[in-house]
C-alpha cells in the first residue's frame, strides 16, 4: 500500500522546552521543574527536567539530525523561565534571548521552519503560587 501526501504537506516534529532543554542557565523554575524538585519520586526512575534530552547543549546536532530525517518544521516552545529575567518587570534575560536566537538561526540555516508556542509545562512557579494566592483569598472570603 502506498500513501501519497500532497506536495505542500509539511513534515514536522514537536518538542517543548521543559521536556527537551533542561534547566541550564535558567533563573526561575517552572511548574514542571518545581514538581520534579519537590517530588522526584513521581518521575520514572527519578529522571526529571534538569538535563532532559539536553537540547540546550546539543541543539545544533539535534537539528541537523532532524534535517537529515527530512523534517521541514519544528514546533518548539520558548520557556518563560529562561527568557524572562525579572518576572515582575518582564525584563528579558539576554542569555536566554541569545540562546533562542541561536536556535532559530540554526533552524533557518537548515531550512527548518519554527512553529513557536509560549506555554508547554512552563508556567513560572512564582506566577503559579501568586495565582493560587489570588484565587484562594476570594474563595476563602466567600466560604467556598
Describe every region a protein language model picked out:
Residues 63-69, 74-119:
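Aromatic-lined substrate-binding rim segments of carbohydrate-active enzymes
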Residues 133-144:
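Single conserved hydrophobic/aromatic residue that forms the stacking wall/gate
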Residues 24, 86-87, 126-127:
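Short, conserved acidic/polar surface loops in the N-terminal third of protein domains
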Residues 19-21, 82-85, 123:
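Flexible loop/turn segments at secondary-structure boundaries
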Residues 15, 77, 139:
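Ser/Thr-centric signal marking residues that sit
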Residues 89-91, 129-132:
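Short low-complexity, flexible loop/linker segments enriched in glycine and/or proline
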Residues 120-130:
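Catalytic cores of eukaryotic secretory-pathway lumenal/extracellular enzymes that build
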Residues 1-69:
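N-terminal carbohydrate-binding accessory modules
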